[in-house]
C-alpha cells in the first residue's frame, strides 16, 4: 500500500518538474525571440512614440518586488501582465491609425506568448491584484476618459512598450 502511494508521489513530482523544466526551456529559448518581434511590431505599427505621459504612474514597485520573487511567481507575473495587455486591446480601436497588419501580428504574438505561459502555471495560482488594478486604471483614466481617441491609444502604446521591455528583462533574469 505504502509502495503504491510512494510511487504515485514520485510520479507526480517528476511530472511537475518536467512541466517546470519545459516552461524554463520555453522561456529561455523562445520568450526573448517573440518579445523582440512584438516590440519591433509595436514600434512599426505607429509613428514615433508620444512624449506625453499617461496620467497613471508606471508600477515600478511591482517590478522591483517581482525581481526578487520565486520562478513560478515570475511566470505568473509575465502571464498576467500579457493577459492584461491583451484585454486593453479588446477596447474600441476605431480611432487608431496604426498599420492594421502590424497590429494584428503584434496581438497574435502576444496571444502565443500567453498560451505558452498559461501552460506553465496552474490555473489555481492567483495573479497580483495591484497589477490588475493598475491596468483597470490605465483603461479608465486613459482610454475611457479620452474616449478611445487616437491620442489615448498612443499613450497606451507607450505604456505597453515600457511593460514589454520590462517583461523582457524579467524573463532574461529567470535563467
Curated annotation (Swiss-Prot):
Tissue-specificity statement: Isoform 1 and isoform 2 are expressed in several tissues, including gill, spleen, intestine, kidney and skin.
Signal peptide as annotated in the record: 1-23
One GO process term, biological-process aspect: positive regulation of protein phosphorylation
GO molecular function, one term: cytokine receptor binding
Highest rank taxon of the organism: Eukaryota
Disulfide bridge partners, by residue number: 24-120
Keywords (A to Z) from UniProt: Antiviral defense, Cytokine, Cytoplasm, Disulfide bond, Secreted, Signal
Induction, as annotated: In the RTG-2 fibroblastic cell line, isoform 1 is highly induced by polyinosine-polycytidylic acid (poly(I:C)), a synthetic analog of dsRNA, that binds TLR3. Isoforms 2 and 3 are also up-regulated by poly(I:C), but to a lesser extent. In vivo, all 3 isoforms are induced by poly(I:C) (in anterior kidney leukocytes) and by viral infection, such as that of viral hemorrhagic septicemia virus (VHSV) (isoform 1>isoform 3>>isoform 2) and infectious hematopoietic necrosis virus (IHNV). However, induction kinetics is isoform-specific.
SUPFAM superfamilies listed in its UniProt record: 4-helical cytokines
Miscellaneous remark of the record: Salmonid type I IFNs are classified into 2 groups with 2 (group I) or 4 (group II) cysteines in the mature peptide. These groups can be further divided into 3 subgroups (group I IFN1-a, IFN1-d and IFN1-e and group II IFN1-b, IFN1-c and IFN1-f). Each subgroup can be represented by several genes (up to at least 7 for IFN1-e).
PANTHER family associated with the record: INTERFERON BETA, TYPE I INTERFERON
Function statement: Key player in antiviral response. Induces expression of TLRs, including that of TLR3, TLR9 and TLR8a1, and that of cytosolic pattern recognition receptors, including RIGI, IFIH1/MDA5 and DHX58/LGP2. Also induces MX1 and its own expression. In the presence of intracellular IFNAR2 (iIFNAR2) and IFNAR1B, intracellular isoform 3 may mediate STAT1 and STAT2 phosphorylation and induction of EIF2AK2, MX1 and RSAD2.
Family to which the UniProt record says this protein belongs: Belongs to the alpha/beta interferon family.
Name under which the protein is recorded: Interferon a3
Native source species: Oncorhynchus mykiss
